[in-house]
Design a protein with these regions (language model features):
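General beta-strand structural signal in soluble alpha/beta enzymes
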Residues: 59, 82-83, 112, 143-145, ...
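Conserved N-terminal catalytic core of the sugar/cofactor nucleotidyltransferase
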Residues: 1-9, 17-24, 35-114, 120-124, ...
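Conserved core of the sugar-phosphate nucleotidyltransferase
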Residues: 122-237, 260, 310, 335
Length: 357
């Protein structure tokens, strides 16, 4: 019996906060930054493959990463990789997948997930996803998965719940507040982080696009009509060149009145920075996260080191540093100044062009 459950993996980002290891030619989602032996996108596929059949996956990515996707997920076919000509944030990405699924199966239920998150308690996570799928099947609802915040982080969307039910209607959805507001949210105990994982019926999200992002609805309806025809590639290129770049959070989730959240605790991290890698990495007795081979540290504490295979490094006298070495770039930066990585990238690009980016 054919399944109506589908999983859409968003895999188009370049992971600039993980520079210089994450590069335009090989971004974060295709790397094994945590040393598990598998890339982030491979972990993501395997996580959802226990819920969704291989034929019901779609991966939305930049056109230049298509071969990488197929290399890391050989279970899927070429037609399951939707290629964005240029990145336009998450709303166009999700629209491309949603209108493709609407054409294929109007009864589809969609799980939408980033490609590069860490889930430590996968059984608990899949139980929550199953509950969300059942809820979405019975209701006209847009569901997101919420995470109890541990700090006032300005990099996440925040969800205010209206009650203490397992699946609660969202009272307020605020995308990336400033620090003062994030601190207030944390103090109330009513707010959760938005994990960026969504569940809904394809009909529900298409209706939300029609209602809240009508220009995207019109454009991607045109893409849907062109699917499988000679005009498909040209239509997709035109739509992505003309459509407004906007996140699904700003474009729909903050405006819609049928948003629900299932909050959970399953060891989630978006692993968005070297600092978060340090947090989850195995450490020595001096709190250093260093490779098991080839790295010799002296009088060094609370630092993280990433080296290419076969490279030897001797490090002495560092406290709370990030050291990332690649074949052509070495970055040494205090952990407290990690937010400057994008500034470093701009400086390198200004003087050396794109070859090191």
């Amino acid at each position: 019996m054919a399944s109506n459950k589908y999983c859409v993996i968003m895999a188009g980002g370049i992971g600039s906060r993980f520079w210089p290891k994450s590069r335009q030619s090989m971004p974060k989602q295709f790397l094994d930054i945590l040393g598990t032996g598998k890339s982030f996108i491979r972990h993501t596929y395997e996580r959802f493959a226990k819920i969704v059949p291989a034929g019901n996956f779609l991966v939305v990515t930049n056109h230049k990463y298509k071969d990488l996707v197929l290399q890391h997920i050989p279970e899927i076919g070429e037609k399951q990789v939707l290629c964005e000509p240029i990145g336009r944030n998450t709303a166009p990405c999700i629209a491309y997948a949603a209108y493709t699924l609407l054409r294929e199966n109007p009864d589809a239920e969609m799980i939408v997930t980033p490609s590069d998150h860490l889930i430590l308690n996968e059984d608990d996570f899949r139980t929550i996803i199953g509950e969300c799928l059942e809820f979405a099947d019975r209701h006209d609802a847009l569901l997101t998965v919420g995470i109890k915040p541990t700090r006032p982080d300005t990099g996440y969307g925040y969800i205010q719940v209206s009650d203490d039910h397992a699946i609660s209607k969202v009272k307020c959805f605020t995308e990336k507040p400033d620090l003062e507001l994030a601190q207030t949210f944390l103090q109330t105990g009513e707010f959760y982080w938005n994990s960026g994982i969504f569940i809904w019926k394809v009909q529900a999200i298409v209706e939300a696009f029609r209602k809240y992002l009508p220009e995207h609805h019109a454009m991607f309806s045109g893409v849907m009509k062109a699917l499988g025809t000679d005009a498909e590639k040209t239509t997709v290129e035109i739509v992505f060149s003309e459509c407004r770049a906007i996140s699904i959070d700003y474009g729909i989730m903050e405006k819609a009145d049928n948003v629900y959240v299932r909050c959970g605790n399953f060891g989630w991290s978006d692993v968005g920075t070297w600092g978060s890698v340090y947090q989850h990495a195995r450490k020595d007795r001096y709190a250093n996260a260093v490779p098991e081979e080839g790295c010799y540290v002296y009088d060094t504490r609370s630092s993280i080191v990433s080296l290419p295979k076969g490279k030897v490094a001797v490090i002495s006298g560092l406290k709370e540093y990030i050291v990332v070495d690649t074949d052509d770039v070495l970055m040494i930066c205090p952990r407290a100044e990690e937010q400057n990585i994008k500034k470093f990238i701009d400086e390198v690009k200004f003087h050396n062009g794109d070859k090191h980016i």
